[in-house]
Amino acid sequence: MDTQFYDVFVTEGENPTFAYRTGLTTYTEGLRDGIFTALGWNGAGYMALAQDGCDPTILNPADYIAPQAFELELDGQSLMSHWAYEGCERIEGKDNLTFKITLRHTVRPVTVKVCTLLDGACVFSRWLEITNRAQSPAALGRLAVLSGGLETTLRWKNHVKDQSADSPYRL
């Protein structure tokens, strides 16, 4: 039997955090001080949040110029911060899971649903549903549906086996 594994683990409260797992790929993001930020990636299927019940902030948002999990600009105004968490929705499909996080901007009348589709593959699909709640139209200037910092491994050579061995790959 070939089963595909996917799930989302949610921690609500002051710092809502969302940990996705599809196959062995995990991705964590959450709202920190009004910024919806990328918090970490893992290719081994391990979700610290689900395992330990702690805040697994692998990536420190303060270490990155743009830690946001998505980028949005309307009418020349960057909407990178000032987000408030409104809730989330889990939509179970036959062979997949769509998870939607609703964020409301506290300065502009804009709502964003961050939508993630998991199907057990090692990659996931991401899109944004943007609602302009103002009476007038808004010009979309910039959009990135998935962004944020990438992890680095200190002392990475300690994790690599003999580089002199025959292999088509080198670090």
Where are these regions (language model features)?
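Polysaccharide-binding surfaces and accessory modules of carbohydrate-active proteins
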Residues: 2-171
